[in-house]
């Protein structure tokens, strides 16, 4: 019944032109509530900021990514810096990606998205850990815990993007908003060298409103130029059917 209700709700959403959505707000202002569901199925991008306890969810509109909404992180654990060992209860930092098999609609923590730790960088440094998630229930032992209401919306948009053809959803996790002022404030940190590898990814998105293309070379993150064209185009919610939540 829930699946049927969701489908009917989407079909009843009034149609608006995509041009109208583009003109509705700037790239740093959240999309208005009446437009949100009409963007379901469009490509998305996630940024997490530990110090600010914020998860920003972006949706592709035209050639750039627009802030869909910001969500407060209930809890994360272990303080600033990358996760290094299984059992250190530390929440990861770095560049990750999510595919469909990493979605957990029946998680013991309501709903969950496995971020894909360890990635190539983590493995190159011998970092260990598993089951690192963005999930609900506001409980964290190394994950990013959201309210159930928050993870509901995040999960729907990530699922929609992947089902509709986005190969993977990038998740960039930063210790803080990596402005020059914040970098200076943390210049004596033991993680300074690591954070300087993350900053080009943050800066690239700030300048272009497009997710950075990141690789790992000789055990270091390297931000490179993205492909000139993306095959996935934004779609409206009326073209998309949500899977039934378990």
UniProtKB/Swiss-Prot annotation:
Q: Which PROSITE patterns match?
A: LD_TPASE
Top-rank taxon: Bacteria
Its Gene Ontology biological processes?
cell wall organization; peptidoglycan biosynthetic process; peptidoglycan metabolic process; regulation of cell shape
The molecular function terms in GO held by this entry are:
carboxypeptidase activity; endopeptidase activity; glycosyltransferase activity
Show which residues constitute the signal peptide: 1-19
The record's InterPro entries line, in alphabetical order, gives: LD_TPept_cat_dom (IPR005490), Transpep_catalytic_dom (IPR038063)
Q: Which regions form coiled coils?
A: none
The protein's matches in SUPFAM superfamilies, at most eight in alphabetical order, are given as:
L,D-transpeptidase catalytic domain-like
Residue span(s) of domain L,D-TPase catalytic: 44-174
State the active site: 135 (proton donor/acceptor), 143 (nucleophile)
Annotated keywords = Cell shape, Cell wall biogenesis/degradation, Glycosyltransferase, Hydrolase, Peptidoglycan synthesis, Signal, Transferase
Q: Which family does it belong to?
A: Belongs to the YkuD family.
Do you know which PANTHER family this protein is assigned to? L,D-TRANSPEPTIDASE YAFK-RELATED, LD-TRANSPEPTIDASE
Which NCBIfam families does this chain map to? Answer: LdtF_DpaA_YafK
| Protein's recorded name | Putative L,D-transpeptidase YafK
State the species of origin.
Answer: Escherichia coli (strain K12)
């Amino acid at each position: 019944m829930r699946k049927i209700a969701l489908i009917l709700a989407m079909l009843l959403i009034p149609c608006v032109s995509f041009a109208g959505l583009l003109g509705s707000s700037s790239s740093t202002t959240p999309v208005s509530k009446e437009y949100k569901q009409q963007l379901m199925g469009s490509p998305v991008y996630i940024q997490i900021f530990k110090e600010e306890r914020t998860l920003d969810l972006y949706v592709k509109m035209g050639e750039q990514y627009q802030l869909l909404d910001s969500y407060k992180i209930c809890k994360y654990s272990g303080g600033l810096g990358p996760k290094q060992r299984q059992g250190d209860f530390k929440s990861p930092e770095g560049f990750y990606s999510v595919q469909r098999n990493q979605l957990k609609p029946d998680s013991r923590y309501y709903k969950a998205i496995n971020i894909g730790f360890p990635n190539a960088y983590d493995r190159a440094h011998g970092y260990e850990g598993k089951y690192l998630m963005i999930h609900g229930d506001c409980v964290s032992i190394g994950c990013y815990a959201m309210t159930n209401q928050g993870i509901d919306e995040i999960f729907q948009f990530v699922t929609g993007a992947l089902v509709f053809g986005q190969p993977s959803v990038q998740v960039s996790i930063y210790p803080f908003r990596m402005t020059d002022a914040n970098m200076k404030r943390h210049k004596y940190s033991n993680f300074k060298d690591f954070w300087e590898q993350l900053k080009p990814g943050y800066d690239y998105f700030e300048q272009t409103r497009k997710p950075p293309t990141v690789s790992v070379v000789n055990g270091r993150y390297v931000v490179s130029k993205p492909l000139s064209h993306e095959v996935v185009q934004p779609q409206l919610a009326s073209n998309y059917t949500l899977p039934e939540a378990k």
